[in-house]
Amino acid sequence: MNTLSDGVIVNRDLIRDNPELIRRFLRAATRAWSYAEVNPQEAVDALIKMFPDSSFLAQPGQALKQWEGHSALMRAPRAEGRVPGWVAPEDVQDTIDLLAEYAELSPKGKMDDYVTNAFLPG
């Protein structure tokens, strides 16, 4: 079962009151994500530096393995060539349909009720 699961959750009031803040945050986040995709060891080293007391990060190679696995899942086939975080309307609808059928999502809704690509750069 393929479902979308990662994303940035934003309160509707923030969208209404400060959309430029969301744009700036997502611009920085997508730049960081794109850089980390090309430089995974450097990204992991920065994470270890930020959280030196993390028992998980202290395990040699574990953080890099997890990053590589997670990174591979972050780009849905329909989002190929897009900025990190961009989602295809079809993928969102597929996820909504699965959740409505198997997880009793109600009301079912449509993409615009849950997701937008409008604040992403590019």
For each feature predicted by the language model, list its residue ranges.
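A bilobed periplasmic-binding-protein/Venus flytrap-type ligand-binding module shared by bacterial periplasmic
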Residues: 4-20
